[in-house]
């Protein structure tokens, strides 16, 4: 039965995880994400799941990786400092194609920064935080409803592409309370199970979509799981240049070749926009209001709300750059996704930045003033 709730974003992430089939959570308390762990500790036992509070964030993501290879869906939640500690395991999960979800409720940074204040300072860390060439998927909610919906989608994407997926929330979205609708059932995708008997199974042999089938430990299949460069059997093959290139390119291509299926943006008034405002997460709320105000004053403004920062929506941004005279990037940092927009729009449109740090969200009038100054 579909029901309505008045809850905060962090609770919605937890409920989204449960609805998506998550049955294992390991984490370490850190502001402003702790409510996710608290809610999972309450909800999981009733669903036959397991909650573990680990000694630190390193152990938390390691435990999730182990649980996922044990056959369940797993998640952890953290904030910037903890996300930094997880990066070695993020790379390991990418290399071993371990599907899992990380919720990063961003706060002011660097270092321990502003534990109780909002930020969007982990955007580049989500994409490039671990060493090496790899691709991940990241989603950026701007409302409590999206915290639920995007967490469900994060699990589906993780399972479909066997990749770590990051939900890039922030303190504002995580702690705001709104009415949301939670359906009785949601679309649930599961990793592909082996279609051949154990004696014939090749664990890292890709299917047509570049994604291998995935058994669980204990199912009777032999599956070596190593962070070393490995062949399709899973055996280390670290001295083979051709083998390494083949593996790493496949890890990237399984995301990049499905970019059109993964990327999600929302647009408003972009058909005739002379100035297009680009944002993601919490600032998108102010952007929509500011653009509406600008249009009421005769300015042909529009907006693009990026729901999937990674993989970056290059096609959509390029189209905006081709049709608009100027682009404005609004984000709660000193400029991170701004550089991606600038890269894609180079030679087509002028790109400006409206940054903000210190823990507060942009006000609509601040954005409106910037738009009016760009006319």
From Swiss-Prot:
It catalyses: 2 oxidized [2Fe-2S]-[ferredoxin] + 2-oxoglutarate + CoA = succinyl-CoA + 2 reduced [2Fe-2S]-[ferredoxin] + CO2 + H(+). InterPro entries: 2-oxoacid_oxidoreductase (IPR052368), PFOR_II (IPR033412), Pyrv_Fd/Flavodoxin_OxRdtase_N (IPR002880), THDP-binding (IPR029061), Transketo_C/PFOR_II (IPR009014). Optimum pH is 9.0. GO terms for molecular function: 2-oxoglutarate synthase activity. It holds the Pfam family PFOR_II. The keyword Oxidoreductase applies. Keywords: Oxidoreductase. Transmembrane segments: none annotated. It comes from Methanothermobacter marburgensis (strain ATCC BAA-927 / DSM 2133 / JCM 14651 / NBRC 100331 / OCM 82 / Marburg) (Methanobacterium thermoautotrophicum). Optimum temperature is 70 degrees Celsius. Heterotetramer of the KorA, KorB, KorC and KorD subunits. Its EC number is 1.2.7.3. It is an enzyme of class 1 (oxidoreductase). This is 2-oxoglutarate synthase subunit KorA. One of its GO terms (biological process) is sulfur compound biosynthetic process. It comes from the Archaea.
């Amino acid at each position: 039965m579909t029901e309505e709730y008045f809850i905060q974003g962090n609770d919605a992430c937890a409920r989204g995880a449960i609805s998506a089939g998550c049955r294992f959570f390991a984490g370490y308390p850190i502001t402003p994400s702790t409510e996710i762990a608290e809610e999972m500790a309450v909800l999981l036992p009733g669903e036959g799941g397991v909650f573990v509070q680990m000694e630190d964030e390193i152990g938390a993501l390691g435990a999730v990786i182990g649980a996922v290879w044990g056959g369940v869906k797993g998640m952890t939640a953290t904030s910037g400092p903890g996300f930094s500690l997880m990066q070695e395991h993020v790379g390991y999960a990418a290399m071993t194609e371990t599907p899992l979800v990380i919720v990063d409720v961003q706060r002011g940074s660097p270092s321990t920064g502003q534990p109780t204040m909002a930020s969007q300072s982990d955007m580049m860390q989500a994409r490039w935080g671990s060493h090496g060439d790899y691709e991940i998927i990241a989603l950026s909610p701007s409302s409590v409803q999206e915290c639920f919906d995007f967490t469900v989608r994060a699990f589906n994407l993780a399972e479909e592409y066997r990749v770590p997926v990051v939900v890039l929330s922030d303190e504002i979205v995580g702690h705001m309370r709104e009415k949301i609708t939670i359906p009785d059932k949601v679309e649930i995708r599961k990793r592909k199970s082996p279609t051949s008997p154990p004696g014939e199974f090749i664990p890292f042999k890709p299917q047509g979509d570049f994604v291998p089938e995935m058994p669980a430990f204990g199912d009777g299949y032999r599956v070596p799981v190593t962070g070393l460069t490995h062949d399709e059997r899973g055996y280390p093959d670290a001295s083979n240049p051709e083998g390494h290139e083949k593996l790493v390119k496949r890890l990237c291509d399984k995301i990049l070749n499905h970019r059109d299926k993964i990327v999600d943006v929302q647009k408003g008034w972009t058909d005739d926009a002379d100035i297009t405002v680009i944002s993601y997460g919490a600032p998108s709320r102010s952007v929509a209001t500011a653009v509406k105000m600008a249009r009421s004053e005769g300015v042909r403004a529009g907006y693009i709300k990026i729901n999937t920062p990674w993989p970056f929506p290059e096609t959509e941004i390029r189209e905006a750059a081709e049709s608009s005279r100027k682009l404005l990037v609004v984000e709660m940092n000193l400029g991170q996704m701004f550089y991606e927009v600038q890269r894609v729009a180079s030679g087509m449109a002028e790109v400006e930045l409206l940054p903000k740090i210190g823990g507060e969200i942009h006000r609509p009038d601040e954005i409106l003033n910037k738009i009016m100054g760009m006319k």
